[in-house]
Amino acid sequence: MFSRLRISHRAERRVRRLWANYGVFWLGAVLVGLVSVVYAKFIDFGFELFRGAVAYASWSPLIFTPIGAALAIGLTQKFFRGAEGSGIPQVIATLEDGRLSSSLLSLRIMLGKIVISFVGILCGFTIGREGPTVQIGASLMYAMRRGYRRSSQHIERQLALAGAAAGLAAAFNTPLAGVVFAIEELTRSFVSRNTGTLITAIIFSGVVALGLQGNYLYFGRIPAFNGFAWALIPALIVASVITGVAGGVFGWILLNVALWMPRPLFELRRTHPVYFAFFCGVAIAVIGLASRGTTFGSGYAEARGLLESHETLSPLYALLKFGALIASYLSGIPGGIFAPSLAIGAGLGNTMSLVTSSVPLPSLAALCMVGYLAAVTQSPITSFVIVMEMIDGHQMVMPLMAVALLATQISRTITPSFYHTLAHRFRSSSRLPALSSPSSI
């Protein structure tokens, strides 16, 4: 009897040890997948409400987009400092300086990211949910440190890194991209002991996401470009140059606001961010109406339509979307640039298709999508893998890789890394820098 009790006690201790070593982490990864799916549905619901309002009264964005912008920035400034913008620079900053984790990866920040980005998409802002999902995943996993009896800075960093990678993978349904993103963008190094942790988190969160949403391709399947064609080479070169320059200029504009913004507007942004956000909302509404509504939101529908060859867009779509994204990000509202960047890239491919018929529109759109995303993030491998996994365009692997690499190199001649420059500003500032502050963007 006593031996049976000893065995039972030993088994209980083993179960507790297994839970302490693995259970907390697995639970966190499952929660990341669950929250990512709910957040995606939440954002989609918000944009459907916006589209319904615009269908009822096409002029309505002129009223509620500026008011919503002012409300969103007011709430962010007062309650959710650190939730501004994409969220990826914040995650990078915490991985490089663990002292920032409690400020930038808290559950309060996660809540603010979800709520304020919902307000933004509800008002038609040009923002995506993928970047915020990275910070949401990192914040949620970082909170799981409380489940460990003895936490450490190493454990906290591993949790945040795994949560960020799992968040991106769940947002795009691109498991491989989650691992590559963590290695190339978040840590800028390959550490073998991280890979098991990353893959485990991505598996658990991915299973939850697939269970709730089913197996799907983010942008569907694009028509194949049959075999290699010499006509693809000049298109590839032109796409690389156009997207590399456009992505580099985008980063330069956001990182050097003080150099180009008129002084009165610059001072308004610094001293009265809520008023500045109101005017950003006016700009977004005007651009949206000028584009007949195509620049509102993330741009997912427009990009997918171009990839499937059933969308007709203005040659100026990419330029108008570019302006709407600049205004959205300068306002300081929580929201990502991944999906809007893909939409801008697809728009550039649409413009290229007007001057050449040798390459199908879906192929041009895919090339410009990967090129522009790579130029903005300066993470060519991540960009190539994301687009490749999202569109099931395996027949275009080599061209996508080439464009991503060339566009990144061109972008680097114009501006430094967008995310890492912002992360450096978070680290070097003695206080939390809001993106509405000129010191942070």
Question: What label would you give each PLM region?
Answer:
Residues 1-441:
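Alpha-helical transmembrane segments and immediately membrane-proximal extracytoplasmic
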